[in-house]
UniProtKB/Swiss-Prot annotation:
Keywords: Ion transport, Sodium, Sodium transport, Transport. This is V-type sodium ATPase subunit C. It comes from the Bacteria. Signal peptide: none annotated. It comes from Enterococcus hirae (strain ATCC 9790 / DSM 20160 / JCM 8729 / LMG 6399 / NBRC 3181 / NCIMB 6459 / NCDO 1258 / NCTC 12367 / WDCM 00089 / R). PANTHER family: V-TYPE ATP SYNTHASE SUBUNIT C. GO terms for molecular function: proton-transporting ATPase activity, rotational mechanism. Belongs to the V-ATPase V0D/AC39 subunit family. GO terms for biological process: sodium ion transport. Involved in ATP-driven sodium extrusion. The keyword Repeat does not apply.
Length: 328
């Protein structure tokens, strides 16, 4: 199937997305039951029953798996889908590597990414060999394996895989050759590096540790970011206001300090805005990616609402945590 054939099908699936107005109605509800009544009129209707909130996370995962599988089978370039679902691949690598090292069974933490099964990943981690995984993934697995032979600190597994994830995003983005997609990937890496650097400054992390966690795949030079890690936050925030992200970051910088919680939310909203150009494109992969992103935002917002209603969050608490919804 070519993109000009797939994209009309994507447009049809977009009609299933929960609208801004419906989310606003759900925010205003006063109970889980009232929230469920509104969800009865959405694609999630089969998952609404007495006590639905207890199973909703598992049902969201089931919906996500079906979507990933359909897109992988339908997309002319499955790698486009993996650009988005790769975050789950690397989550699985973290979990299953820790299981291999500690001898624990962590299979229940596996998240289907549409590409690599639990068995394939476990076997690759155990044997260091795979005919099904890309060479780049095997290189990352071996790098982590070498680390684990020298260290028992499990946090290092997360650190290495997080950096490898960003490297793989950039590599695949360049390989696919879509300028708008590569721009989004680089912005994602830059904003991740900015968040990581700010957190490192606050936690007084060593230069050695920060060298390991900051990616060199963004547009802001790694050495530039590293130059701030032993300094004051004020110097870093002043620098940020000279970058291409200054207008965005002004919203989360106050009195030379950076609000990291708000930055994470702002990052999601900013990256979502990249995909809005997909509304005018009949060809290419952007409509597919826009839809995947919209579904991910929808899932995050639904989780927030269910947790919020269960724990009696105020309207203000819910609104300030909600991700931006774009009606595609």
């Amino acid at each position: 199937m070519e993109y000009h054939e797939l994209n009309p099908l994507i447009r049809g699936r977009e009609l299933e997305l929960i609208s801004k107005d419906t989310f606003e109605q759900m925010i205003q509800t006063d109970s889980i039951d009232s929230l469920g009544e509104i969800l009865q009129s959405t694609i999630y209707q089969p998952y609404i029953y007495d006590g639905f909130d207890k199973d909703f996370e598992a049902n969201l995962s089931q919906e996500r798996s079906k979507l990933f599988q359909w897109l992988k089978e339908s997309a002319p370039e499955p790698e486009i889908v993996w650009i988005y679902t790769m975050r789950y691949t690397f989550h699985n690598l973290k979990v299953l590597t820790k299981a291999e090292i500690t001898g624990q069974n962590l299979d229940h933490l596996y998240i289907h990414d549409g590409f690599y099964s639990l068995e394939v990943l476990k076997d690759a981690i155990h044997t260091q060999v795979s005919v099904e995984l890309p060479d780049s993934l095997m290189d990352y697995i071996r790098e982590v394996h070498e680390y684990c032979e020298e260290s028992t600190i499990l946090q290092g597994i997360d650190v290495i895989y997080d950096r490898c994830f960003l490297t793989e995003q950039r590599r695949l983005g360049e390989q696919l050759g879509y300028p708008e997609l590569l721009e989004e990937i680089i912005a994602f890496i830059d904003l991740t590096n900015i968040t990581t650097t700010a957190r490192g400054i606050l936690q007084h992390r060593s230069a050695g540790f920060m060298t390991t966690v900051i990616s060199s795949s963004g547009s802001i030079p790694k050495d530039t970011l590293l130059s701030f890690v032993r300094g004051e936050m004020a110097s870093f925030t002043q620098f940020l206001l000279t970058t291409d992200y200054s207008e965005l970051l002004k919203q989360v910088i106050h009195e030379e300090q950076i609000d990291l919680v708000s930055l994470e939310q702002l990052k999601d909203d900013y990256l979502s805005s990249f995909y809005q150009v997909a509304q005018t494109q009949a060809f290419g992969p952007l409509p597919l990616l826009a839809f995947l992103n919209a579904k991910e935002v929808e899932s995050k917002n639904l989780r927030l609402l269910i947790i919020g209603k269960r724990n009696h969050f105020s309207l203000e608490q819910l609104k300030e945590r909600m991700r931006q919804v774009y009606d595609l």
